[in-house]
């Protein structure tokens, strides 16, 4: 059944005397309660951190620009700065150094280098957008070029670097496909024999490679697990810890603001069936951009994504099919006069939704940037229509073909709403040209969107089956291609792997748009991995997300 289009004619809210049967999900409650509401920001402490950062920041800048530093040490320094989440502070200086070093690259210079050094150099270039050739790893393969040399397995740090490097591979880079499988197998066999910080480094990488992790969490773990690497330059470690504590205060204040807003909106009272996940949603948005200048953007995007949670859970876990049709029509109309046609329990949400968007549009119109709000609103309407289509399929027992499922599933993944809402508060960088580029649906965006859909499906399909929800991508793939459940999951994982390669390609220079605009696209794919790699971390946040929220917002970094 085709998605319902925008309609100017209101549907009728016909009341039934019988109490409707509702697909209530009984989601677990919030594990945080009002913990983050009690935070009180002391701006003087933030100012102290900001002032304390100036000296080590200047010391790190001088190190990056040091003309006497050996090129391999310079690349190691840049890699460490990047892993610690400090790149944005020194972007011009770092790019100037990498431009020069990349032009000077000569494969012969790598012949005598060890695996660890080559891996660090490779990652430093690739993470910052420079396509260093993967041929630098050829020397570690046997003469027949079919397998890697067993001798390198004794260099655990080098193997770890090889594994992390392989996550940056592109399509056609077969040596890195082989490197990923080889290094992962060997590291898994060695991890229980390791001790100290190296054991922690390997465990963390096998759990989730840096490239697929949440930047703020990865930075925090790096200066905890890589003290030796950071200690080469005391100023870097000092800056990283001060930076983390500064950001933590800012972000705890943002979390308090959205938590208070959520409480004031009374969604848990008017729509008590929904998932109460304010810290989790804020964490998700923080994963898109952690830099101080995006504070307003995080608050706006968190609020819009919380609206999305209410909508999703209403469609999935409470509303009847008749109510879903009425609500979809009202969202298509986007007019307060449509409120009378929808059930009373969802009217407060509908009014708040319209009011918040109207206020956003009014604010950004003053700056000439209202189009980003309009794009977010239209994406919200699209997802409502997509949710309706899923509900119609569930209601009729229809299992869509895989291509049909994906066409609608990419919409209902919520990717489009979140990615466009993330742009709303980013400021002048979101120009008309940037919005046109987003609307053109470039390859990197398609790849990130696909990961968002399929990673979710692979992890949640059994839970959705048990709840009697619409078929996921796993079910549709099984039906369409007549394969087993295992084969279907393996094929979807291959699609996810290939999508990561396309994202990696899209982040390399020359880029279609600035990395500031590409970062949320890359980071949305990363956050999907964080939330859904091992379980449905959003519905059941007691594991990974609780760990991450505790790490970032409960307790500062010891100096």
UniProtKB/Swiss-Prot annotation:
Pathway: Secondary metabolite biosynthesis; terpenoid biosynthesis. Its EC number is 4.2.3.23. Keywords: Lyase, Magnesium, Metal-binding, Oxidoreductase. Mg(2+) 1 binds at residues 312, 316. It catalyses: (2E,6E)-farnesyl diphosphate = (+)-(R)-germacrene A + diphosphate. A motif (DDXXD motif) lies at residues 312-316. Binds 3 Mg(2+) ions per subunit. It holds the Pfam family Terpene_synth_C. It is an enzyme of class 4 (lyase). Mg(2+) 2 binds at residues 312, 316. GO terms for biological process: diterpenoid biosynthetic process; sesquiterpene biosynthetic process. Sesquiterpene synthase involved in germacrene A biosynthesis. Germacrene A is a precursor of several sesquiterpene lactones. This is Germacrene A synthase 1. The gene is GAS1.
């Amino acid at each position: 059944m085709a998605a319902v289009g925008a309609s100017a004619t209101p549907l009728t809210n016909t009341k039934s005397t019988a109490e409707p049967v509702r697909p209530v999900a009984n989601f677990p409650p919030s594990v945080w309660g009002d913990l983050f509401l009690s935070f009180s920001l002391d701006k003087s402490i933030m100012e102290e951190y900001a002032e304390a950062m100036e000296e080590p920041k200047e010391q790190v800048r001088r190190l990056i620009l040091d003309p006497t530093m050996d090129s391999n040490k310079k690349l190691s320094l840049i890699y460490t700065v990047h892993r610690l989440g400090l790149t944005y502070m020194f972007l011009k200086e770092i790019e100037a150094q990498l431009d020069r070093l990349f032009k000077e690259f000569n494969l012969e210079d790598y012949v005598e280098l060890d695996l660890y050094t080559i891996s660090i150099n490779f990652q430093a270039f690739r993470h910052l957008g420079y396509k260093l050739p993967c041929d630098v790893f050829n020397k570690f393969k046997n003469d027949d070029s079919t397998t890697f040399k067993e001798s390198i397995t004794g260099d655990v740090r080098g193997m770890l670097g090889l594994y992390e490097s392989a996550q940056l591979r592109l399509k056609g880079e077969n040596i890195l496909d082989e490197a990923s499988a080889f290094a992962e197998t060997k590291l898994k066999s060695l991890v229980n024999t390791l001790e100290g910080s190296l054991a922690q480094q390997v465990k963390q990488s096998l759990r989730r490679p840096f490239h697929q992790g949440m930047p703020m969490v990865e930075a925090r773990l790096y200066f905890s697990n890589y003290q030796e690497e950071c200690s080469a330059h005391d100023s870097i470690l000092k800056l990283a810890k001060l930076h983390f504590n500064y950001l933590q205060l800012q972000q705890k204040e943002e979390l308090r603001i959205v938590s208070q807003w959520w409480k004031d909106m009374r969604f848990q009272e008017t729509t008590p069936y929904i998932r109460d996940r304010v810290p989790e949603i804020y964490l998700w948005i923080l994963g898109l951009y952690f830099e101080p200048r995006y504070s307003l953007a995080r608050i706006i995007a968190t609020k819009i994504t919380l609206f999305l949670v209410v909508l999703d859970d209403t469609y999935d876990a409470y509303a009847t099919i008749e109510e879903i049709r009425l609500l979809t029509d009202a969202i298509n109309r986007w007019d307060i006069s449509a409120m009378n046609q929808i059930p009373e329990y969802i009217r407060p949400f509908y009014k708040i939704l319209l009011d918040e968007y109207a206020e956003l549009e009014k604010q950004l119109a003053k700056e000439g940037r209202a189009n980003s709000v309009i794009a977010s609103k239209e994406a919200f309407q699209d997802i409502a229509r997509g949710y309706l289509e899923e509900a119609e399929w569930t209601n009729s027992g229809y299992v869509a073909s895989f291509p049909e499922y994906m066409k609608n599933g990419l919409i209902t993944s919520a990717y489009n709403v979140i990615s466009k809402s993330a742009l709303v508060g980013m400021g002048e960088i979101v120009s008309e040209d940037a919005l046109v580029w987003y609307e053109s649906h470039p390859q990197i965006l398609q790849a990130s969107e696909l990961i968002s859909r399929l990673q979710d499906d692979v992890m949640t399909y059994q839970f959705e089956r048990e709840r009697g929800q619409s078929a996921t991508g796993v079910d549709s793939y099984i039906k369409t291609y007549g394969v087993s459940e295992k084969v279907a999951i393996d094929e979807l994982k291959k699609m996810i792997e290939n999508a990561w390669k396309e994202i990696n390609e899209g982040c390399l220079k020359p880029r279609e748009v600035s990395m500031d605009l590409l970062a949320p696209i890359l980071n949305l794919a990363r956050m999907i991995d964080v939330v859904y790699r091992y379980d449905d971390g959003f519905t059941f946040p007691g594991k990974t997300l609780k760990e991450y929220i505790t790490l970032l917002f409960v307790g500062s970094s010891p100096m």
